Amino acid sequence: MAPNTRVSKCQISRPILVGNDAKPLTKEEKEKAPTDHTHTWRIFVEGVDGEDISKWVRKVVFKLHDTYNNPTRTIESPPFEVIETGWGEFDIMVRIFFAPEAHEKALTFYHHLKLHPYGPRMEEMKASGGLVESVQYEEIVFNEPFEYTYKLLSQNPIGDGHGLAVESEPDHPFSQQLEQDEADKLDFAIQEVKKTIEMYKQQVQSLQGQKSSTPVE
């Protein structure tokens, strides 16, 4: 089969991690950073269980906030990451390009840069020096991939077949623990939104009550 021929009725996928970590600047780091910057942070794309994604990822382009010098950063070799300092949170566009031989279109993801502890683990994060980790698990699916992509991914299986680790470790940040933490963060955010909606409802009802009780002259 020719390399530029698609493998029909076939689907092959690869998991990746798109995320960031951040921590407050130390006194020494503050002296070197812009005066308004408060944190050092890292945005990254990496494989699960230490997989070398450079075998099938050609480059990763990170689009930072326009206030940064050279906001479009192109990383063509691992680690696919950008390390910066800053003071605010914002959305980062992450564009992943594959090997030319794969004939696959680039994929775009968006990651919201997190700098400050939040959610159920807020106090734990503060106690650990303010280190924040925000990681998205993404599944890249190749439907009817070209022969080159199919062979490349088939010959380079991922992980050790034991699934996700129970707890996070420095070399393996994505785990059942992190997955649960992300779910807890979502639940926390949903509850906060519900509280806000209820507060506004009460304010509206109060205003309506005041209006109806005001005598008409």
Swiss-Prot record:
Name of a matching Pfam family: YEATS
Coiled-coil zones: 180-214
Top-rank taxon, per record: Eukaryota
Gene name linked to the record: yaf9
Family to which the UniProt record says this protein belongs: Belongs to the YAF9 family.
Function: Component of the SWR1 complex which mediates the ATP-dependent exchange of histone H2A for the H2A variant HZT1 leading to transcriptional regulation of selected genes by chromatin remodeling. Component of the NuA4 histone acetyltransferase complex which is involved in transcriptional activation of selected genes principally by acetylation of nucleosomal histones H4 and H2A. The NuA4 complex is also involved in DNA repair. Yaf9 may also be required for viability in conditions in which the structural integrity of the spindle is compromised.
InterPro entries: YEAST_sf, YEATS, YEATS_dom
Intracellular or extracellular location(s): Cytoplasm; Nucleus
Key words of the record: Activator, Chromatin regulator, Coiled coil, Cytoplasm, DNA damage, DNA repair, Nucleus, Transcription, Transcription regulation
Disulfide pattern: none
Domain comment in the entry: The coiled-coil domain is required for assembly into the NuA4 complex.
Subunit and interaction comment: Component of the SWR1 chromatin-remodeling complex and of the NuA4 histone acetyltransferase complex.
Record bears the keyword rRNA processing: no
Protein name: Protein AF-9 homolog
Molecular-function GO terms, alphabetical: histone binding
GO terms under biological process: chromatin remodeling; DNA repair; DNA repair-dependent chromatin remodeling; regulation of transcription by RNA polymerase II; transcription initiation-coupled chromatin remodeling
Single GO cellular component term: Swr1 complex
Residues annotated as domain YEATS: 6-156
